[in-house]
């Protein structure tokens, strides 16, 4: 990606160098369930059980439940690579602010910017305590997205998803959940899922996740239009990321077969489809994941 001269967002809390207390009620954000499965797979554990446990603890919505604990200082110097990745993340967040502010204004709405929290290990949130083990996540309780930047290393080593635009896709997806919150979609889905059995709740979760993928594509469309940010190979990076985090892809890799009723983020084909649809159209009205039949997803 070409980010030369791009501003960095000021809506960032840098909690790196601080560590939370005991772990409690971990929830999964985008890729979090899949990372849990990948870690289990590469360590000889049961990936499907690990993924389902993470999903059940979280509800598949990228929010956290748990008990807040003390936070302690653990200062250290960060490497040049770590600092560059932090800078990159704040530039991507700034890009989402610019794009979504304009889109909301076009629809006579006001975009309330989220805050991005950078942390290491564990941190407190309004939704409970978050853990780096479960990847990036969005907490609607405080309208913040939480990222331990070491997750991007995990993406590369465990899932084979690498490249700056792949990382940007992850951030834009979490911002997509914030857009869902601001428009009331997330709350409505939460309420409905609470009354559903697990299989139906999984299906609802898939629609939320695919919509966030679509919104990530919409952001990329307009960010490139505004700033000329995309370079050769960038789109392929994001498409590859969407493919390797598909529920079916990871389950087949881990177990040799997939269990469709357990899918809660969408198949590789679905995730690539909705990201590409957002990228190609840039039109938020095309994000009709809650209006499609299951076969149309």
Where are these regions (language model features)?
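Catalytic zinc-binding patch centered on the HExxH motif and its immediate surroundings
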Residues: 122-148
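Short pre-active-site segment immediately N-terminal to the catalytic Zn-binding motif
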Residues: 151-170, 200-206
């Amino acid at each position: 990606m070409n980010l030369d001269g791009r501003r960095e967002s000021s809506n960032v809390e840098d909690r790196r160098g601080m560590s939370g207390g005991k772990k409690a009620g971990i929830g999964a954000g985008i890729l979090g369930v899949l990372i849990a499965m990948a870690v289990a797979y590469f360590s000889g554990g049961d990936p499907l059980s690990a993924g389902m446990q993470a999903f059940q603890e979280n509800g598949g919505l990228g929010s956290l439940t748990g008990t807040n604990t003390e936070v302690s200082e653990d200062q250290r110097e960060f490497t040049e690579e770590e600092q560059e990745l932090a800078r990159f993340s704040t530039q991507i967040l700034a890009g989402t602010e610019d794009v979504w502010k304009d889109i909301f204004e076009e629809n006579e709405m006001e975009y309330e910017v989220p805050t991005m929290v950078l942390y290491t290990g564990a941190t407190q949130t309004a939704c409970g305590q978050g853990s780096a083990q479960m990847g990036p996540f969005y907490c609607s309780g405080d309208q913040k997205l939480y990222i331990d930047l070491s997750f991007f290393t995990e993406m590369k080593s465990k899932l084979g998803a690498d490249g700056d635009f792949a990382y940007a896709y992850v951030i834009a997806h979490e911002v997509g959940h914030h857009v869902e919150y601001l428009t009331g979609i997330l709350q409505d889905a939460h309420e409905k899922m609470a009354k559903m059995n697990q299989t139906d709740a999984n299906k609802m979760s898939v629609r939320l996740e695919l919509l966030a993928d679509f919104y990530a594509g919409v952001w990329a469309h307009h960010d490139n239009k505004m700033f000329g940010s995309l370079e050769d190979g960038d789109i392929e990076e994001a498409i590859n990321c969407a493919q390797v985090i598909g529920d079916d892809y990871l389950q087949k890799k881990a177990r040799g077969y997939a269990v469709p009723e357990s899918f809660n983020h969408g198949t590789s084909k679905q995730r690539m489809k909705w990201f590409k649809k957002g990228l190609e159209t840039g039109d938020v009205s095309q994000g009709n994941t809650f209006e499609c039949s299951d076969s149309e997803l």
